[in-house]
Amino acid sequence: MITRLSHLFLRTLRDDPSDAEVASHKLLVRAGYVRRIAPGVYSWLPLGLRVLREVERVVREEMNAIGGQEILLPALLPRDPYEASNRWTEYGPNLFRLKDRKGNDYMLGPTHEELFALTVKGEYNSYKDFPVTLYQVQTKYRDEERPRAGILRGREFLMKDSYSFDLSDEGLTESYQAHRGAYEKIFTRLGVKYVIVSATSGAMGGSASEEFLAESEIGEDTYVRCLESGYAANVEAVKTVVPDSIPFDGLPEAKVYDTANTPTIDTLVDWANGADLGRTITAADTLKNIMVKTRLPGGEWELLGIGIPGDREVDEKRLEASLEPAEFVMITETDFKNNPFLAKGYIGPKALQANGVRYLVDPRVVDGTSWITGADEDGKHVVGLVAGRDFTPDGTIEAAEVRDGDASPDGAGTLVSARGIEIGHVFQLGRKYTDVFTVDVLAENGKPVRPTMGSYGVGVSRLVAVIAEQHHDEKGLRWPAEVSPADVYLVIANKDETAREGAEGLAAQLDRAGLEVILDDRKASPGVKFKDSELIGVPLIVVVGRGWADGKVEIRDRFTGESREIDADSAIEAIISAVRG
C-alpha cells in the first residue's frame, strides 16, 4: 500500500505540547499520532492507529498461538455482578459509575473477571469443555485522579485481557506459564526492554502474581532486584528479611524521660545524644508510630497504629497493598480530639493496646529489640521499651520503604532499585470468582467440580507509548519494524519531474513487492520533508533527490543514522533486503 502524505490526515508540530512532560507524549503529539480530547482521553489519528493495530496484531498472534479464543464483551457493565464480588465498592473512586433512565446502576469496565466467569458458566457444564482460555482486546476505563504522560496513564485505554479456566491447580499453573511465555514473546517482538517482577494481586485477588515492567526512568512503578541472584519484585511485594529474636536476659528496664519539644524523630535523636544514654543514638534506634484509619468495603472506620523503625518512611503503596481490600486515610486533628489517649508526637504502643487499638509493626520489630518511642504523654518518651516484653504487637505489616542495600528476601545479596512502566500482569486467581458465581461443571466422576481461573492483562495502547519512550532520539521517533506505520518512508527531495516520476515508480514497485510505503509527495522544502521523516520514525528512509540524475538513490537507517547511496537500478532489491533482513 502507498500512503501519500499529500492526502494523509496529518499535521506535524514543531513545538512540544505545553502539557507534555515525557518524551513519548511530546513526540506522539508532535508527529501527529494522537491528539488530546480531555484529561486522560486521546484520539488516535491515522498513523497512530496503524501502530496501535500493529501492536494488537502481535498480541493476537501470540495469544492465538497458546490456544486463546477471542471474544468481545461490553464495556458498559451492570452493577450486580460487581456487587456480588464486592468490587463495586472495592474499586472506590476509580470507577466511572452511571445510571440509565430507569435508575439502574452501570459502570464503564476497568476489568472483566466477573463477566468472563458468568460467560463460561452460561455456556459450559462438563469437564469435556475444559481447559479453555478466552481473551478480548477491549477499551477499559479508570477514573484516574491525575492522568499524566499522555497515553501512558489515561482514563480510557485499550487492553488485552485474557482468562484461563482449568479444573485443577496443575492446569492453572500450565495456563499461567503459557501466558507468561506468550508475554515474553510479545514484548521481545515489540522491541521492549522489560523485567519480570513478583507483584501483589490487589483488588484482583488470587495468589501468584507477576508484573512485566518496561525499563524506564519515568516509570511510576519502583522495583528492586538482587544482582547476585536475579530476584526481582515490585516494592509492594518485597518481604522484609526478619532478624532473629533477642533473648530478654540482661536487657535493662524501660525508663520514661522528660523530652520536651521532641515531636519528630530528628528532635528525639538530638535529645537522646545529649542525654548521656551510654551510646550514640540514631534514628534506627527509635520506633515511630503512625496512626491511620482503615475501613473494609461496606464497613466502619477503625483506628490502626503502625510501628516502624524511625529511620524509615512509610511507603503508601506498600501500606495500601498490605491493607487491601481495606482502604486507609491518615488521622486528622478531629481524630486526636476524639481519642485523647493519642498524644500527638508522643504516641507509644502501650496506650494503643490499652484502648483496644490494633497495633501492627514492621517485621524488624522482633522480640528482644529495644526501642526509644513515645510514652503516651506530651513531652515524654520511653527508652528501652522491649518488644515481646514490654509490649506485644497484634502482628506485622509491610509498610516501611524498601531501600537500596536492604537484604534480598532470597538471602543472596542486597537490593538495588529501578523504575519501570507496567505493561503486563499475570495472576493465578484461583476460585475467587467461580466461587462468587457458583461456576460448577460435572467432573468425569459425575460430581460437580469448580474451575480455577487465571487473569492476564497487557496494556495495548500503553505499549505504543512505551515503545516510543524506549525508541526515540533528539530528532523524533524510531519505530521497530514490527510496529512501524510503514516499511519505507520515501522522500521526493527534488522538484525535477524526472525524479518525481522515478520516486513514483519506486513506490509502485515496493508496493507490488508487498511493502507499506509512505510517499512524501508534498510541495514542501526538502528540509521540512527530512525533519518530518525523522520525527515520524519509519525505520528506513529512502531519498530520491539530486542523485537521481546520476542514477543514485539514498537510503537512511533511522536507528543507526547511517546513510548510503545505491544504484537506482538495484534500489528495489536493496530496499527489500534492508526491510526484510
UniProtKB/Swiss-Prot annotation:
Its EC number is 6.1.1.15. The keyword ATP-binding applies. Transmembrane segments: none annotated. One of its GO terms (molecular function) is aminoacyl-tRNA deacylase activity. It is found in: Cytoplasm. It catalyses: tRNA(Pro) + L-proline + ATP = L-prolyl-tRNA(Pro) + AMP + diphosphate. GO terms for biological process: prolyl-tRNA aminoacylation. One of its GO terms (cellular component) is cytosol. HAMAP family: Pro_tRNA_synth_type1. NCBIfam families: PRK09194.1, proS_fam_II. Catalyzes the attachment of proline to tRNA(Pro) in a two-step reaction: proline is first activated by ATP to form Pro-AMP and then transferred to the acceptor end of tRNA(Pro). As ProRS can inadvertently accommodate and process non-cognate amino acids such as alanine and cysteine, to avoid such errors it has two additional distinct editing activities against alanine. One activity is designated as 'pretransfer' editing and involves the tRNA(Pro)-independent hydrolysis of activated Ala-AMP. Consists of three domains: the N-terminal catalytic domain, the editing domain and the C-terminal anticodon-binding domain. This is Proline--tRNA ligase. It comes from Rhodococcus erythropolis (strain PR4 / NBRC 100887). The gene is proS.
